[in-house]
Amino acid sequence: MSEKHPGPLVVEGKLTDAERMKLESNYLRGTIAEDLNDGLTGGFKGDNFLLIRFHGMYQQDDRDIRAERAEQKLEPRHAMLLRCRLPGGVITTKQWQAIDKFAGENTIYGSIRLTNRQTFQFHGILKKNVKPVHQMLHSVGLDALATANDMNRNVLCTSNPYESQLHAEAYEWAKKISEHLLPRTRAYAEIWLDQEKVATTDEEPILGQTYLPRKFKTTVVIPPQNDIDLHANDMNFVAIAENGKLVGFNLLVGGGLSIEHGNKKTYARTASEFGYLPLEHTLAVAEAVVTTQRDWGNRTDRKNAKTKYTLERVGVETFKAEVERRAGIKFEPIRPYEFTGRGDRIGWVKGIDDNWHLTLFIENGRILDYPGRPLKTGLLEIAKIHKGDFRITANQNLIITGVPESEKAKIEKIAKESGLMNAVTPQRENSMACVSFPTCPLAMAEAERFLPSFIDNIDNLMAKHGVSDEHIVMRVTGCPNGCGRAMLAEVGLVGKAPGRYNLHLGGNRIGTRIPRMYKENITEPEILASLDELIGRWAKEREAGEGFGDFTVRAGIIRPVLDPARDLWD
């Protein structure tokens, strides 16, 4: 302990079992290859259950039928979730056609799920289809490496820019950062792609033999949009432009939303500003942040292992100085930037190159053929004729990019006929949920299946109080891990038990303030009763342009969270 920082740089003590597992895994190989051939179980055993996460998969089961199968003396219906690595959410139409085919033919649920980390997931991959899915991805230039567990996960990049040139530059950096921080082990290629074992020894110069202490998330942000919710992420590069050209980044470190119910040592935290850096130092700084967290992060307690806790333990200035030392730079003062919103601009938007971009609202990001709304088939038909790319947004929507004027009518016709352009309220456009039941093993309450009817009720309240043309950033997450990013919403519901949620208020529209718990463990009717009263007050008492979250703070309904590490639970 020194006087410079509040706690030790390295936490001494017994390492978690996850650290043992990583060390003994032979650079993430484990016995996954052998386990694949075990037909006695539909799942992976022992360490492999966790090791497959480094390869982009989670083992799950259908919780709707878990009890029924137990009664029949059957093991749970194991199936894998696979998450693709897709920096910035950009996917070609050729790649889309391949994933559409796989989802339809080789998954239990037949759907493609767009996520709020700008990628897609397959749910319900049986063990026999696990190797084929990796080979299918590889055949179209994709992979699932490092999209889960203790790695730098899928790198986000603002997807609805006002200037296409700036987006192109920022997207290139998102890709470079993603590639630079990837694990170097050949385990992925050996196990899934049948590449030969090479005699050389594996090395992980950046991540190390035991990888990172915990998950690590990175973004590239183009103000004034904060669509990627930078404060939910460990490392954020905020684009600074001069005359429409990218010149450098402001770096913000240490955001994160995951908490544990009732555990006051856990907290959501907004990211801290470190300073400005010119473009040429980007990769060195990214590596320095990651290696500092690698060496200083807490490996004795996974609930205290994220970058946000390291920053609070050692102090922001100490961490920043170490990043400067490792990167061989001095940060310049933060350059001015501001955010004005987080939502996607649904519908047609003209780019600066005379091409058009069509943003399609996809409720909960779930792409499936619904009765009367064949979303999946519609997108496949568009993918067959569209010459540009698709872009997945951090709001779980899809952008068809680079549509020339001559193709606009054709694409719009397919989109309308497939239900991809059905009109929805501003409120629905600004609401989001994680997957939760039936596939997520951590789910405590419904989220994706709860949201549509819940928003019907909220729409009725908005109409009742004369604010139907307005919106409140509203999010539901099925457990406190926070994948639905409810802890950056104006109204956040965090699942507590079946049918029960903690209601959080006081975030803001631009995603720079953590909401505080207003009521604990309440039901949907209780939530709606509270919001009925509060939306009524907001409609009558708000100032010009004042969002719901800002109103709840100004009116004294909720105390703002100013320093989450210390006052979130007050």
Curated annotation (Swiss-Prot):
Could you say which residues bind siroheme here? Answer: C483
Give yes or no: UniProt keyword Transmembrane helix: no
The record's Gene Ontology cellular component field reads: sulfite reductase complex (NADPH)
Swiss-Prot/TrEMBL keywords = 4Fe-4S, Amino-acid biosynthesis, Cysteine biosynthesis, Heme, Iron, Iron-sulfur, Metal-binding, NADP, Oxidoreductase
Kindly indicate where the leader peptide sits in this chain. Answer: none
Q: Which reaction does it catalyse?
A: hydrogen sulfide + 3 NADP(+) + 3 H2O = sulfite + 3 NADPH + 4 H(+)
Tell me, which GO biological process terms does this entry list?
cysteine biosynthetic process; hydrogen sulfide biosynthetic process; sulfate assimilation
Q: In which pathway does it act?
A: Sulfur metabolism; hydrogen sulfide biosynthesis; hydrogen sulfide from sulfite (NADPH route): step 1/1
The UniProt annotation places [4Fe-4S] cluster binding at C434, C440, C479, C483
Give me the comment on cofactor binding. Answer: Binds 1 siroheme per subunit. Binds 1 [4Fe-4S] cluster per subunit.
Leading EC class? oxidoreductase
| PANTHER family given in the database record | SULFITE REDUCTASE [NADPH] SUBUNIT BETA (PTHR11493:SF47), SULFITE REDUCTASE [NADPH] SUBUNIT BETA-RELATED (PTHR11493)
Job of this protein: Component of the sulfite reductase complex that catalyzes the 6-electron reduction of sulfite to sulfide. This is one of several activities required for the biosynthesis of L-cysteine from sulfate.
What is its quaternary makeup?
Alpha(8)-beta(8). The alpha component is a flavoprotein, the beta component is a hemoprotein.
**Recorded family membership:** Belongs to the nitrite and sulfite reductase 4Fe-4S domain family.
What name does this protein carry? Sulfite reductase [NADPH] hemoprotein beta-component
* Gene that this polypeptide is encoded by: cysI
